[in-house]
Amino acid sequence: MRGKVSLEEAFELPKFAAQTKEKAELYIAPNNRDRYFEEILNPCGNRLELSNKHGIGYTIYSIYSPGPQGWTERAECEEYARECNDYISGEIANHKDRMGAFAALSMHDPKQASEELTRCVKELGFLGALVNDVQHAGPEGETHIFYDQPEWDIFWQTCVDLDVPFYLHPEPPFGSYLRNQYEGRKYLIGPPVSFANGVSLHVLGMIVNGVFDRFPKLKVILGHLGEHIPGDFWRIEHWFEHCSRPLAKSRGDVFAEKPLLHYFRNNIWLTTSGNFSTETLKFCVEHVGAERILFSVDSPYEHIDVGCGWYDDNAKAIMEAVGGEKAYKDIGRDNAKKLFKLGKFYDSEA
């Protein structure tokens, strides 16, 4: 398929190449690191050539993980996020028909995060924000700032007012959490377990704490076909309905006003990033609808040729899985065009 839109694609500032290499040792195989470093530090290098070769018409770039969420000092974090945004804006300036960007944000303070998001959308033309799970603060990043509490309503209102999506992306564990949880099970860091554990806790916290009830027009994107949540749709809702909601009501606590699937069908989109499983895609489409699914690769953690090869080489099987050619094209391109209000781009009408 030509003109695919891919929207979970990472970069890092070249000045932090050494730190990037250190963090890559957590979950990038030794024989894959040279390619990884070349791509993550050069968003407009051979990745554009690979996009041409494999039918990606438009790429939305975002800062790599943990990005600003790993900066524990507020002032330094805000400076780094702004530098990331200015850098990627400059990098893609000559490729506006091929590339866009998500804002990197310091999430130490909701008001400042709102201001930087507004700057990025209104002045730099960015398409939303991507944040790498919780914001770390304090010694060794021991304080985890979640965005599911009422003090973050000012930020969510900004997202709604700007009418842009918020991508909640995973981050690697570090500090005492890394030592306590993963020192003896380091090969579960990243896609096998740790990424999904963090994001699923966070987005479910947003649901049960009423964020989407207070902001019914809020748009949130989850990668990797839902961070393990879809497989537990029934069990989560079963427990919400028969235990959690009655408990919350008896205690006078806030709780989600609607069934779990309501939020996944009205507020949340899922991407195929790093989860190139036709069977899992079919399951997600059956539960949330093809209109809630967006193609993505997750480069440079995943290979562009692998992600695109799955979608293109298995087109017939995927069409059967998702409900036909229209749904196939919607997932590959047209859902993203609608969500991000994209104009014409390379192969956008192919």
Swiss-Prot record:
Inhibited by AgNO(3), HgCl(2), p-chloromercuribenzoic acid and NiCl(2). GO terms for cellular component: cytosol. It comes from the Eukaryota. Optimum pH is 5.5 for decarboxylase activity. Belongs to the metallo-dependent hydrolases superfamily. The keyword Cytoplasm does not apply. PANTHER family: 2-AMINO-3-CARBOXYLMUCONATE-6-SEMIALDEHYDE DECARBOXYLASE, AMIDOHYDROLASE FAMILY PROTEIN (AFU_ORTHOLOGUE AFUA_7G05840). Gene3D superfamilies: Metal-dependent hydrolases (3.20.20.140). One of its GO terms (molecular function) is hydrolase activity. The lineage of its organism: Eukaryota, Fungi, Dikarya, Basidiomycota, Agaricomycotina. It catalyses: salicylate + H(+) = phenol + CO2. Optimum temperature is 40 degrees Celsius for the decarboxylase activity and 30 degrees Celsius for carboxylase activity. Homotetramer. Its EC number is 4.1.1.91. Keywords: Decarboxylase, Lyase. Reversibly catalyzes the regioselective carboxylation of phenol to form salicylic acid. Involved in a pathway for the degradation of salicylate via phenol. Also catalyzes the decarboxylation of beta-resorcylic acid (2,4-dihydroxybenzoic acid) into resorcinol (1,3-dihydroxybenzene), gamma-resorcylic acid (2,6-dihydroxybenzoic acid) into resorcinol, 2,3-dihydroxybenzoic acid into catechol (1,2-dihydroxybenzene), and 4-aminosalicylic acid into 3-aminophenol. This is Salicylate decarboxylase. The keyword Manganese does not apply. GO terms for biological process: secondary metabolic process.
